[in-house]
Amino acid sequence: MGEGALAPGLQLLLRACEQGDTDTARRLLEPGADPVAGPEAGAEPAGPEAVRAAEAGAPVPVDCSDEAGNSALQLAAAGGHEPLVRFLLRRGASVNSRNHYGWSALMQAARCGHVSVAHLLLDHGADVNAQNRLGASVLTVASRGGHLGVVKLLLEAGAIVDHHTPSGESPATGGSGDELLGITALMAAVQHGHEAVVRLLMEWGADPNHTARTVGWSPLMLAALLGKLNVAQQLVEKGANPDHLSVLEKTAFEVALDRKYRDLAEYLDPLTTVRPKTDEEKRRPDIFYALKMGNFQLVKEIADEDPNHVNLVNGDGATPLMLAAVTGHLPLVQLLVEKHADMDKQDSVHGWTALMQATYHGNKEIVKYLLNQGADVALRAKNGYTAFDLVMLLNDPDTELVRLLASVCMQVNKDRGRPSHRPPLPHSKARQPWSIPVLPDDKGGLKSWWSRMSNRFRKLKLMQTLPRGLAANQPLPFSDEPELALDSTMRAPPQDRTSHLGPPEAAHATKDSGPGNPRREKGDVLLTTMLRNGAPFPRLPSDKLKAVIPPFLPPSSFELWSSDRSHTCHNGKADPTKTALPPRASRAHPVGCVGTDGATSRPVKFPSISRSPASPASSGSFNHSPHSSGGASGIGGMSRLGGELHSRSGGSVDSVLSQIAAQRKKAAGLCEQKPRQQSSPVGPATSSSPPELPASLPSSGSGSSSGPSSSKKLDPSKRPPSGTSATSKSTSPTLTPSPSPKGHTAESSVSSSSSHRQSKSSGGSSSGTITDEDELTGILKKLSLEKYQPIFEEQEVDMEAFLTLTDGDLQELGIKTDGSRQQILAAISELNAGKGRERQILQETIHNFHSSFESSASNTRAPGNGPSMAGWTRPEETVSSRR
């Protein structure tokens, strides 16, 4: 035992326990005590050196152990010395102590079949389900030895019959038992041919079909290995599966044949349905091997012989169709599809389909074929990617492949009526048939970053994708960049607009229902224009991504992206293509063209604004000023950079200033005319909020109210009843009547649209900070409409977006009840009215500050940079006093 390193007293105690010498153990543990009884029968008497050591030495600890961790109690239990075990337990020996291999005293007694000792240990609280480091339990070691009495005792004491996982309370297991075979007590008894123990375990519910990990052997296979016919019969009677295959694909019948146990083989032969493969079958390659070799004829023979082979799954969970899609052999793909291979099956590792494999490996012809055969483009891999997402991840994606997948994905979304919560494509709809995709013939390509913004572009309300609370003078990186500005790539030529569906920036707030609504075709125009005018660079630097925001998105806290909405003011007439859009009724306000949104779809002319500079959409340049309308109305566009920025948008400084000077003279008269201008054919549209200051004035330090000249030219008696608001500050360019407008709805829309336009045009105002979702939740709770909260959360509608919703938007969100929509619209109207008054006070304060500042700095103002702020004060004060 290697006791040389132990103290003499410990060596004597361990030797006495191993030999069953109770007297010596008592002398060592109780110095000075008289022996009560002699040594146990069969035990060696203690030598004179042991007696002297016991008389002269100090007491020896009862839980001492040798180098292997075996304690005195374990040695006594292994030897079956019941009196010594009883004495050690009385002296306080630990009943559940383990040696270095995880063996306890009970396991030692069970291994050797000592029933009385095992019973004594169980009475003192020994763990009946303890396991050693090999994962063997107390019941397993007892079954291995065939000790029927101990097995029965353990089962009656509560031992788990199929306990094959390591016990977590064992201090020495270390979790390594999970990597072992997982042998159960039944398997141990079968392996060693103990029929009585097998019968007892089966009566206690042992699982006859439990298999050992890593090798896949069952108890029936172990019986076949030993040729134990009686044991095999017991197992089959209890439900053992004779068709079970090991990892070597062998059954118990084949094991018996290999071991030449004829009687056992004859017994298992009629019970086994999985027949052994012949030598020819073993030599014949499977369909995966044939696909890897590209042998079309062999694949065809295998598929003809058994069509089920086309849907086999290999170790990685891949199907033959996936392998063919990777290799790029179109004839093989066609053959497998004709044999009814599952095109939409996903592998078990990554969740990829055959379409994803073909897309990722650039096999364009296979992608076309699979799409024509109806492969599902909406399926997502385990990481959430679709086939379209995968092609966008490529460093140099094939442009035609991108168009192909994009058109089909849009058609799928169109067929489904509306995009799901996570559609597979960043764009919404397409006009091409699914089976025969027709792609735009252009040479550009989508950028890889476009897929990152897909979820934002498809939302009902897009303003939550824009940064909030940005300063009015924040630099914008699209000014002098060598590549095309995004608004330029999105526009169509002005002379061709009547033949197109309309610019995408005008379609994002329309409805999906109803004939002639451009929303159902917006995504196609968006995709087509992006493909035709995509920037030549394959990737954009990461530091530019924050600036890649399409100009047609509704503004959040400044009006940079509303420039393209000024088409109604170009050349003094409305854009014919925009008259097909539903209206958002709006009260007139001093910024932009002075007029209100009407309810009809007739084109409206604005002769007073014919001198306005071209908007960025038609000029191809981008205005730096966050408050510029791109020259749409010629007013409200002066920023801190003065006329220089207006000239960048294609306009003239003199033209802008002359219009400003002319229009600011009639700011007061304009406000008086407003109630008369708000009547419309669809119902009352009188605003519930007081008129506000020009929202572009406070933040930019320059801006203007409408003057007398513009008011005179836009006299209500001469304005068509369907007058469209020429301001570019509208967050929803909706210009045609809703399907079923009502008076209350129109009134709510008026307040929502007008107030939101004014609040958004103040670049650094407080309106951009209203983003608390709790506020929106509280509003819905007050209205007792909490059931619609998940709808707003799903569409990411924050408080800022909520204030811009119209009746049509609410219907599109899924709020079908008229009463609920009316409640929400009334709440929006009241909120916009209150926030408008708050902004008015703030704007007046900021305006007074700028007026004082400009007056002090008027001596240093460079000529041509715009009029002094001091000259802008009187019209604003007049307007405020009349409010």
From Swiss-Prot:
The residue ranges flagged as biased composition, category Low complexity, are 607-630, 687-711, 720-737, 748-768
- How would you summarize where this protein is expressed among tissues? Expressed in kidney (at protein level).
Q: Where is this site: Essential for ANKS3 interaction?
A: 821
Show the Gene3D superfamilies listed in the entry. Ankyrin repeat-containing domain, Transcription Factor, Ets-1
User: Which residue windows does the record flag with biased composition (Polar residues)?
Assistant: 649-661, 852-862
Q: Where is the composition biased (Gly residues)?
A: 631-640
Q: Which SMART domains match?
A: ANK (SM00248), SAM (SM00454)
This protein's UniProt keywords: ANK repeat, Cell projection, Cilium, Cytoplasm, Hydroxylation, Phosphoprotein, Repeat
Positions where Phosphoserine occurs in the chain: 649, 732, 740
Question: What modifications follow translation?
Answer: Hydroxylated at Asn-129, most probably by HIF1AN. This hydroxylation results in decreased NEK8-binding.
Bias (Basic and acidic residues) ranges: 566-576, 874-883
Give Gene Ontology CC terms. ciliary inversin compartment; cytoplasm
Q: Where is the signal peptide?
A: none
Region described as Disordered: spans on this chain: 30-50, 414-439, 490-522, 566-773, 852-883
Subcellular location per UniProt equals: Cell projection, Cilium; Cytoplasm
Boundaries of every SAM domain copy: 771-834
Name the Pfam families for this protein: Ank, Ank_2, SAM_1
ANK repeats, residue ranges: 8-37, 68-97, 101-130, 134-163, 181-210, 215-244, 282-312, 316-345, 350-379, 383-414
Recorded domain comment: The ankyrin repeats are necessary and sufficient for NEK8-binding.
Q: How does it assemble?
A: Homooligomer. Interacts with NEK8. Central component of a complex containing at least ANKS6, INVS, NEK8 and NPHP3. ANKS6 may organize complex assembly by linking INVS and NPHP3 to NEK8 and INVS may target the complex to the proximal ciliary axoneme. Interacts (via SAM domain) with BICC1 (via KH domains) in an RNA-dependent manner. Interacts (via SAM domain) with ANKS3 (via SAM domain).
> PANTHER family, alphabetically?
MASK PROTEIN, PROTEIN KINASE DOMAIN-CONTAINING PROTEIN
Q: What does this protein do?
A: Required for renal function.
Its protein name is: Ankyrin repeat and SAM domain-containing protein 6
Native source species: Mus musculus (Mouse)
